[in-house]
Regions:
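Bacterial Sec-dependent N-terminal signal peptides
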Residues: 2-27, 54, 84-104, 175-209, ...
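Surface-exposed binding patches on compact interaction domains or structured appendages
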Residues: 34-63, 102-103, 123-152
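Juxtadomain low-complexity/linker regions and immediately adjacent membrane-anchoring helices
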Residues: 190-234, 275-286, 328-399, 800
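Aromatic, loop-rich ligand-recognition surfaces of beta-strand-rich domains
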Residues: 234-299, 308-362
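Beta/coil-rich, acidic/histidine-enriched accessory regions frequently appended to metallopeptidases
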Residues: 355, 361-397, 771-859
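Beta-strand-enriched, solvent-exposed domains that form extended recognition/catalytic surfaces
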Residues: 358-519
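Catalytic cores of extracellular degradative/oxidative enzymes
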Residues: 530-533, 540-738
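Active-site-proximal alpha-helical
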Residues: 692-804, 808, 813
Length: 859
């Protein structure tokens, strides 16, 4: 029967399970050994698959007892330890009466700088070890003949570029009367030592992480059932504390959260982890207090968390001795007044046993040795991780590219999202070129942060049937940061400012002393290195960065579709992003986005756009990762999705326009920038209509329908590409005919740049969708400096309507005769003349005629 043990802790965290040894060897006599089991589970069990091997639980120890063996050969059993769904096994071996040698660990991998290796040998014969010449015996801790003996050997530092293999062979010493037929038993320990040609970081186990202080309990002045404060210190980052969903009361804020530590402690900092599955409740303005006795509280800090999605470390100016911490949440993200939520709140004391960088390195980033350091100095270092790092450096074998970098600050993209009324651009402008594995220790050495919050995001795009965009954030502080990575992925530095221009946000030097170099390609600094960097990539995904765009696609897709022309690929995406910004008027009005447009591969849906990124199914890569196709037939998709991000709300995106006005950008990129045929001109429409122009003319102008509600032959009523026609006609006439477009104006201005600038500056508060549609007409007249009422009337913008429109959301679009009369009065009051051409008939095939002013006849 399995044995069970229970923890005395009331709170269950995410289960952990560690066993001090995974192989246990016994002599043939009945005996027992004890192993330490480390777990935070409430209960754990142990069970053996053999009756001669019996596990028993004594507190936190697992005692394994074996019966005497009368068998000839070594026998084996497996003990399974299970804790809260986690399971690990222990291999149990026992000698028989025939000669045998058992070694509990028979393979070691050591760094180039050398290391000590330890293992136990259990045998019933006298043995003699034979060593490779670069492995030497260290002082024994104990020795006992023909039972279990602990051995310790030192592996000398290597000066070789490549790995080397060595062995320690234990061979039975035969008695003097042995005959030639007696064959000695033997067992081998293999030792692999890394060479100097490729840096291999130590595991970092010797680096002492800061001490996480246990929270005993807590209280909240407001909470939603199922979202109690206990969810914010249960060790599970997927569960959250959440304030009451009813936030309508005038006294909803402030909300007070109190955390009580298990004991009074010296506390150096805390970490706030916001929820990862939404925005509601992410902290904004918070007052933090502390108390040594749990009753009298002292103000500690005022912190604006800005509703950030990143984990935030709050470092105290000096350690505080505290039993309790109180958070007075004054504002939080979310609808209405907002809410308060927290995935985890953690409190830490710095570890006094931390490595002193000044013994070997020039600064806290440990990116170069201090002047005068010798190999003898390095040999004295008692921290294997830093000893190994220093050894590579002194041998001139440490490659700093992608491991050491200066990372600049970027404005939070939410800033320009607010001023430009668009989706926010990228949060991932600082790729590192480092990839990490789940559960590995990532050692990050950080220089002066200049008082700013810096964090890492690990993004794992390998999400079958999903989109892995996002990831886990890890706050950083100056000095040594030891991070235990929860999920594999690529690493990005998150360094964002609250304002567009912040002179104090100087670059931060960061050293990734572990993790794997995957690299990335930046067209602005890696000219001519595409083949080299892509060839060296080790991860499934690879970052390609341009001046205006940044994409993360599968490495193999780059190799397959852009093997020798990745620079052209990112230049094309830069062109799309840049030219859409120019058509928005952002260059003309000195409002260019400071963040890049981000594109990532995903495995659900087809393509889509949302906050901070656009996403593309892996099945589209043969088109959008191929420069030859991207600049011809495949440009529409990315231009369309990026166009969604750039839609100016609400002035150029009222109800019904979500899949319409973004395609102003698609048409512009397809025709004006890449010189391809226009989709609405050339796309095959079957037997009834020649093209979208014909279909739109018949469905709206001839029928006298509202632009928002028209019908055509067939099942595709309210075709969004038909709705696009008048918007594109405006660019054809004012842009291609009159030259009022960014490519033809030296200031990068034009008709649409002015339209978008008006929409950015206009306050639409209190306006209905019908008001906004009519205001767009006014905007166009103002920007064109022409009276365009006839044009918009023919295209149904002035046609009365009162109908619910489904467009991701459902709202009623109302345009009344009185509203139209008011618009006419307002536009006519501008005093502009009407166009002297039949503007409603211009098309991609006919705009040249408008240049020559040939007569256009309706029909």
């Amino acid at each position: 029967m399995p044995l069970a043990a229970c923890s005395s802790d009331d709170e269950i965290a995410i289960a952990t399970l560690e066993i001090s040894k995974t192989t246990v060897d016994f002599k043939s006599e009945a005996s027992e050994q004890s192993l330490t089991i480390t777990t935070n589970a409430v209960a754990w069990t142990a069970q053996s698959d053999k009756s001669w091997c019996r596990p028993s639980i004594v507190g936190k120890l697992l005692k394994i007892s074996v019966d005497q063996s009368d068998e000839r050969l070594v026998r084996e059993a497996t003990v399974s330890v299970t804790a809260d769904g986690l399971s690990k096994t222990i291999r149990v071996r026992q000698l028989g009466y025939e000669a045998a040698i058992l070694i509990d660990q028979q393979a070691f991998e050591v760094p180039a700088v050398g290391a000590q290796i330890k293992f136990a040998v259990t045998t019933n014969v006298e043995v003699e070890p034979i060593l490779s010449d670069w492995i030497v015996e260290a002082p024994k801790t104990r020795s006992a003949e023909m039972v279990t003996t602990d051995y310790c050997y030192s592996v000398r530092a290597s000066i070789l570029d490549n790995k080397r293999q060595g062995t320690i062979v234990f061979t039975e010493k035969l008695p003097e009367d042995a005959t030639e037929n007696d064959v000695p038993v033997s067992a081998t320990v293999s030792v692999t030592q890394h060479g100097l040609n490729e840096y291999n970081a130590d595991t970092g186990e010797d680096i002492k992480g800061d001490i996480k202080l246990k929270v005993k309990d807590g209280t909240a002045s407001s909470f939603q059932g199922g979202g109690e404060i206990e969810k914010s210190f249960d060790g599970d980052y997927s569960t959250i504390y959440h304030s009451s969903w009813n936030n309508s009361g005038s006294n909803y804020f402030p909300i007070t959260l109190t955390y009580n530590l298990e004991e009074v402690s010296d506390v150096d900092y805390l970490v706030y982890y916001p929820r990862t599955d939404g925005a509601n409740g992410k902290f904004k303005e918070v007052e933090i207090q502390y108390s040594e006795d749990g009753s009298a509280f002292t103000p500690l800090a005022d912190k604006d968390f800005l509703g950030s999605a990143s984990a935030t470390k709050v470092l105290f100016d000096a350690p505080v001795r505290a039993k309790s911490f109180r958070f007075i949440v004054k504002t939080g993200a979310g609808d209405g007044q907002g809410f308060a939520s927290c995935a985890e709140m953690e409190f830490y004391a710095k570890n006094p046993e931390a490595f002193d960088y000044s013994t070997l390195f020039a600064d806290e980033t440990c990116s170069e040795l201090k002047a005068g350091i010798t190999e003898a100095d390095i040999e004295k270092c008692e921290f294997p991780f830093f000893k190994n790092l220093a050894y590579y450096m002194i041998k001139g074998k440490y490659e700093p590219e992608f491991r050491v970098g200066e990372f600049k600050a970027y404005p939070n993209p939410d800033i320009q999202s607010g001023t430009h009324k668009t989706n926010p651009y990228s949060l991932l402008d600082n790729p590192t070129g480092i990839s990490v594995k789940a559960n590995e220790n990532l050692i990050v050495l950080v220089g002066d942060t200049h008082g700013y919050d810096i964090s890492l995001k690990v993004q794992n795009l390998d999400a079958p049937e999903s989109d892995g965009f996002g990831g886990v954030t890890y706050p950083l502080s100056r000095g040594t940061n030891k991070l235990t990575i929860s999920e594999k992925g690529l690493v990005y530095v998150m360094y964002h400012t609250r304002t567009l221009d912040d002179a104090a946000a100087l670059p931060v030097k960061i050293h990734f002393a572990s993790g794997t170099v995957n690299g990335y390609f930046d067209s602005q600094k890696h000219e001519g290195r595409w083949n080299e960097l892509l060839g060296k990539a080790t991860d499934k995904y690879f970052d390609v960065v341009g001046k205006y765009a940044h994409m993360t696609f599968e490495t193999n897709d780059y190799r397959k579709y852009a093997a020798n022309n990745g620079n052209e690929l990112i230049d094309l995406y830069d062109q799309i992003a840049l030219n859409e910004m120019q058509l928005l008027g952002l260059e003309k009005y000195d409002k260019m986005f400071r963040n890049r447009m981000y594109l990532n591969v995903m495995y659900q849906s087809y393509m889509y756009a949302t906050s901070y990124h656009t996403a593309y199914n892996q099945t589209t890569m043969s088109d959008i990762c191929n420069p030859s196709k991207l600049k011809t037939s495949a440009c529409w998709g990315p231009a369309h999705e990026i166009g969604h991000c750039n839609q100016t709300r609400l002035g150029v995106m009222w109800i019904g326009m979500t899949e319409v006005t973004n395609n102003i950008m698609s048409e512009y990129i397809q025709t004006t920038i890449f010189g391809q045929g226009s989709r609405i001109q050339t796309e095959d429409m079957g037997d009834v209509y020649r093209n979208r122009y014909s279909k739109a003319w018949n469905g709206i102008i001839v029928a006298g329908s509202s632009h928002a509600d028209f019908s055509n032959i067939g099942d595709d009523a309210n075709d969004v590409f038909c709705k696009l026609v008048p918007f594109w006609q405006l660019e054809l006439y004012f842009g291609k005919v009159l030259g009022r477009t960014p490519l033809q104006q030296s200031d990068k201005g034009g008709f649409y740049p002015d339209v978008y600038e008006y929409a950015r500056n206009k306050d639409y508060t209190g306006m209905t969708d019908g008001d906004i549609q009519l205001d767009f007409v006014y905007n166009c007249c103002l920007s064109a400096k022409m009276n365009l009422l006839d044009f918009f009337e023919k295209w149904g913008f002035l046609t009365p309507i009162n109908k619910k429109i489904e467009d991701y959301d459902t709202r009623t679009l109302t345009v009344t005769p009185d509203m139209v009369d008011a618009l006419r009065h307002k536009v006519n009051g501008l005093g502009y003349s009407k166009p002297d051409v039949a503007l409603e008939y211009i098309s991609d095939n006919s705009f040249e005629l408008y240049k020559s002013r040939a007569s256009v006849v309706a029909g």
